[in-house]
């Protein structure tokens, strides 16, 4: 405690014997021993109180961390997790039900061509050189966005799929007329 070796204790004992004397030396040593006992007792009490305060502080920290863990696990209880999972499943089922309740989608295939549309397509192709897409008026009105015309629609506008009488219309031949009225027109 004081870091005193044997040689230093012998020096202190010799000085005490010379200074105090041999008669009073045992009484002085007894008194020094009592003071040392009191000092040790005070030191042990202080040490005990200090350790008790440290334990209380550790217990308070442990209790605080335990309460934090308890609060965190309160939100993760299995009943709460099952309730949350059940609500998510019911939401998913409601989404699927709304998809099933919606009206069926009408097909987007064009209506079958009529002879008028073939004549119109043939005329358009002859004038512009591009095939005309044949669609019904209801489909044209229902289209909200401009989409590229699929190749199948172009195929309907070709003359290969047209009825035989409209695919190759007969050439327009002038009807035979009498040459007499034409001659009369030249003469006048």
Swiss-Prot record:
Compositionally biased, Low complexity: which spans?
A: 160-170
- The segments labelled Disordered in the record are 147-188
Where does this protein chiefly localize? membrane
Q: Which keywords does the record carry?
A: Cell inner membrane, Cell membrane, Membrane, Protein transport, Translocation, Transmembrane, Transmembrane helix, Transport
The record's annotation in InterPro entries points to: TatB (IPR018448)
Tell me, how does this one assemble? The Tat system comprises two distinct complexes: a TatABC complex, containing multiple copies of TatA, TatB and TatC subunits, and a separate TatA complex, containing only TatA subunits. Substrates initially bind to the TatABC complex, which probably triggers association of the separate TatA complex to form the active translocon.
Q: Which family does it belong to?
A: Belongs to the TatB family.
From the Swiss-Prot or TrEMBL record, give the protein name: Sec-independent protein translocase protein TatB
The major lineage groups are: Bacteria, Pseudomonadati, Pseudomonadota, Alphaproteobacteria, Hyphomicrobiales
